C-alpha cells in the first residue's frame, strides 16, 4: 500500500528512537482548508517576510507565480533550530535542501528522497484539491508540472542525491528510512 509523503513524515517524527524534531516552514500563501497556523506552516504576510529578510533570518526562500498570485515558501533561522546536536526533519524542495546544506554544512544536512510514481502523485493531488472549498485545478496542474521539473533526474544528480527510497511497501520503506537515519548518527 502506498502512503503519502506527509504520512511518512509523521511516522518518522513519532518514532522515538530517531529523536527527530519538526521544522515548520513559513509561507505567504493563504491557509487551506484543514490547515492550522504553526502546524503545517507559519502563515505570514509580505511585511513579516520583509522584516525577517532585513534581520537576516531567512535561510532559503522560493517564490512561485501561481494562478492566485505569487506565493513564497521559506525556512527561517528561528526558535525551532536551537541545538545543532539535535536531529530535525523538514519537507522541502531540492532548492531548499541545497540552501539548508550550504547554511548549516553538508555534514549536518542529510537528504531523504522518497520517490512516488507520477500517476499516484497526480491522483493524490486531485483528491486533495477536491476537498477544498474552491478547488483550483489549474493551479494543481501547474504545481504538478513544476514538481516534475524541480525534481528531474538532472536536478537530483546536481544536488548529489544518491540515496532514494521507493514509496511502495509500507513497512519496508519505513524500515529502510529509519535504518538510514540511524546510520547517519553513527
Question: Where in this protein do the model-derived segments appear?
Answer:
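Short, small-residue-biased leader/transition segments that mark boundaries at the very start
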Residues: 1-5
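A conserved segment at the C-terminal end of the G1
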Residues: 6-18
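Short beta-strand-centered segment that lines the nucleotide-binding/catalytic pocket of NTP-utilizing
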Residues: 16-31
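Short glycine-/polar-rich loops that comprise or flank the Walker A/P-loop
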Residues: 18-20, 105-110, 158-162
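ATP-dependent small-molecule kinase phosphotransfer cores
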Residues: 27-88, 92-94
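Conserved AAA+ ATPase "sensor/coupling" helix adjacent to the nucleotide-binding pocket
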Residues: 56-59, 127-132, 180-184
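Conserved phosphate-donor/acceptor-positioning beta-strand/loop module used by diverse small-molecule
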Residues: 87-93, 104-128
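Small-molecule kinase domains that catalyze NTP-dependent phosphoryl transfer to phosphate-bearing small molecules
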Residues: 130-180
Amino acid at each position: 500500500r502506498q502512503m503519502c509523503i506527509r504520512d511518512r513524515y509523521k511516522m518518522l517524527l513519532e518514532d522515538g528512537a530517531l529523536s527527530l524534531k519538526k521544522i515548520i516552514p513559513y509561507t505567504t500563501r493563504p491557509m487551506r482548508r484543514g490547515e492550522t497556523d504553526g502546524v503545517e506552516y507559519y502563515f505570514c504576510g509580505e511585511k513579516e517576510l520583509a522584516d525577517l529578510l532585513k534581520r537576516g533570518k531567512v535561510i532559503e526562500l522560493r517564490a512561485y507565480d501561481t494562478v492566485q498570485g505569487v506565493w513564497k515558501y521559506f525556512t527561517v533561522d528561528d526558535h525551532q533550530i536551537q541545538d545543532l546536536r539535535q536531529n530535525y526533519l523538514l519537507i522541502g524542495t531540492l532548492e531548499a535542501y541545497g540552501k539548508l546544506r550550504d547554511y548549516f554544512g553538508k555534514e549536518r544536512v542529510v537528504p531523504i528522497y522518497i520517490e512516488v510514481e507520477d500517476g499516484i502523485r497526480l491522483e493524490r493531488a486531485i483528491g486533495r484539491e477536491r476537498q477544498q472549498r474552491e478547488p483550483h485545478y489549474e493551479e494543481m496542474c501547474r504545481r504538478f508540472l513544476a514538481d516534475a521539473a524541480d525534481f528531474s533526474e538532472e536536478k537530483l544528480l546536481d544536488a548529489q542525491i544518491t540515496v532514494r527510497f521507493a514509496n511502495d511497501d509500507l513497512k519496508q520503506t519505513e524500515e529502510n528510512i529509519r535504518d538510514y537515519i540511524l546510520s547517519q548518527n553513527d
